[in-house]
Swiss-Prot record:
Homodimer. It holds the Pfam family TIM. Belongs to the triosephosphate isomerase family. This is Triosephosphate isomerase. GO terms for biological process: gluconeogenesis; glyceraldehyde-3-phosphate biosynthetic process; glycerol catabolic process; glycolytic process. The lineage of its organism: Bacteria, Pseudomonadati, Campylobacterota, Epsilonproteobacteria, Campylobacterales. Its main location: cytoplasm. GO terms for cellular component: cytosol. Keywords: Cytoplasm, Gluconeogenesis, Glycolysis, Isomerase. The keyword Cytoplasm applies. PANTHER family: TRIOSEPHOSPHATE ISOMERASE. It comes from Campylobacter curvus (strain 525.92).
Amino acid sequence: MKFLANLKCNHTRASFAEYAKILDANLSADDDVSVFVPFTAFDAKEHKFKLGAQNFYPCVSGAFTGEIGKAQLDEFGISSVLIGHSERREILGESERLLRAKFDFAAKNGWQIIYCVGENLSVNEAGGTKEFLRTQLGNIDTGYANLIVAYEPIWAIGTGKSASAEQIAEILGFLRTLTLAPLLYGGSVNAANIGEIARIRECGGVLVGTASWDATNFLNLIASSRERI
């Protein structure tokens, strides 16, 4: 099972060094863990987890103020990227056109892409979730070999309100009809609900936000998944 930690706008270079030290001391070679860190916390050290980028601009380098490109990611050996997270779609206004440009650039370079999709509460309550997700995935090549799709219902992100196991199973089952890529769930995942989520047939892992920001909490979540699978 894959465990992806999205640290978002949390951790400094110093605090992440301590975070990484705790993970490295407790993870095993069998654990499939990735951590998406703030740019300032990138390091070139060997870890028992994979480092990933929360964002990038589809360029090697150039006149793109405030952005980071392939040249900077290459310096740290980073080749795993998040694309389409709802906070970048909703708060920062990333368009489908930009998301497609990011996807195409990442795919051209053979990067691992974690492509995030998810509906807001109004779409969910109107029963339009599946068609909404079909449209979002229609923007990319779902046959890309190094693709992972993360389903994150917007109404569950950072709210403490996770989708039910039945809801997650239904949506991941639907997404399986659209792609053969590994499927993840994200949205208020924690140590208390990971066991139930881990038992969902099409769930290949989780994209964890708040519950991953503390290294010990994240390790407890991983351990809880083993106990309850």
